[in-house]
Amino acid sequence: MASSSLFLLGALLVLASWQAIVAYDPSPLQDFCVADMNSPVRVNGFACKNPMDVSSEDFFNAAKFDMPRNTFNKLGSNVTNLNVMEFPGLNTLGISLARIDYAPMGVNPPHIHPRATELLTVLEGTLYVGFVTSNPNKLFSKVVCKGDVFVFPKAMIHFQMNLDHDKPAVAQSALSSQNPGVITIASAVFGSQPPISDDVLTKAFQVEKKLIDWLQSQFWENNY
């Protein structure tokens, strides 16, 4: 009996640990917690608005996700985020959205979302998409068309590119965090402020110092 009890206790501890590991955002402990953006309280997320002051408008956002965005930039893409910063009703719900517009041959460059898995749906056009795993860095990529869905696992480097030379493309992403965050690899490495030592980058990328200096001198434009 004692051994059975110990086995059960061990199994419960493993299950509890597993649940803690796989959880991205903390699970809500109440029906909702609309973010109070003016609260002086600092927590992991946002303090709750008084439930008595919450209305239907707190769960609505006129995002205009049906409207094309301006893709006139070096990357030829535009990401419109709808996370807790724009939509306080998402607080504690563990979800956010993004609309991604691509100019012909536009690219959403390699980046990561440190706090979220991303589920991308192609609304218009044809995209080349992919992600790279942790070491030894295997690439999983595919050409996806209108109506197709592709998932990028949490914190993996991933990208999308519009393959059409003449037509724009549009996608929409659901992300498993109210605030997924984004780190664009190229601009993070070569455009950080203050800059990373060129000695570090020269050795890391195994190229000449003048190439690193040139890369660091560029204007690294974002698409969001």
From Swiss-Prot:
Keywords: Apoplast, Disulfide bond, Glycoprotein, Manganese, Metal-binding, Secreted, Signal
Residues annotated for Mn(2+) binding in this entry: H111, H113, E118, H158
Residues modified by glycosylation: N78
Pfam families in the record: Cupin_1 (PF00190)
Cystine pairs: C33-C48
Signal peptide: 1-23
Record's subcellular location: Secreted, Extracellular space, Apoplast
Keyword Isomerase: no
CDD domains (UniProt xref): cupin_OxOx
GO cellular component labels: apoplast
An MF annotation (GO) of this entry: manganese ion binding
Subunit structure: Oligomer (believed to be a pentamer but probably hexamer).
Function: Plays a role in broad-spectrum disease resistance. Probably has no oxalate oxidase activity even if the active site is conserved.
Family: Belongs to the germin family.
Protein name: Germin-like protein 8-12
